[in-house]
C-alpha cells in the first residue's frame, strides 16, 4: 500500500490542483479500497460524501464491463458512461450539484475496481468553499445510510 500511495499521491494532488485548487490545502489523508461488486449489482445515482476532496476509480477486472455513469442531476438526466477499459482511471472532485454518478455490473461479470480518494475531516471548510449549509450536510450524511438500507436510494 505504501508503494501505491507513493506512486499515486503526487499525481492525485496535481489532478486536485487542476480540478479544485481551493481544496488542496484541506487534504489530510488518502483512502484506498479494492472493491468487487456482483454482476447484477447497481448502486443508485449519488454524489460522493463531502469529505472526499478527490474521488478516483481505476477499472481493474474484467476486460469489459459497465463504466461509471455521470449525470447532470439526481434524476439521471443526460447519462454519460465513462467506458470501462482495464486500467482506465476516472478522477473528479465532488461538488454539491455537479458530480452525480452511479455504477453497475454488466450482468455478465463481477466488477473489480481500485478506489483512491483524497480526504479531509474538515467538512465545515468544504461546505464554506461550496457555499452549502453545513448542518444540512451533516443531517444528510447521518440519514443516508438508513435511506439506502431501506429504500436503495440516497438523499
Regions found by a protein language model. Give the residues of each.
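Non-heme Fe(II)/2-oxoglutarate
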Residues: 1-25
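Substrate-binding/active-site groove segments that recognize
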Residues: 56
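Conserved short histidine dyad/triad with adjacent acidic residue
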Residues: 33-49
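Active-site rim elements
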Residues: 1-7, 42-43, 102-104
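Conserved aromatic-histidine-acidic binding/catalytic patches
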Residues: 4-7, 48, 79
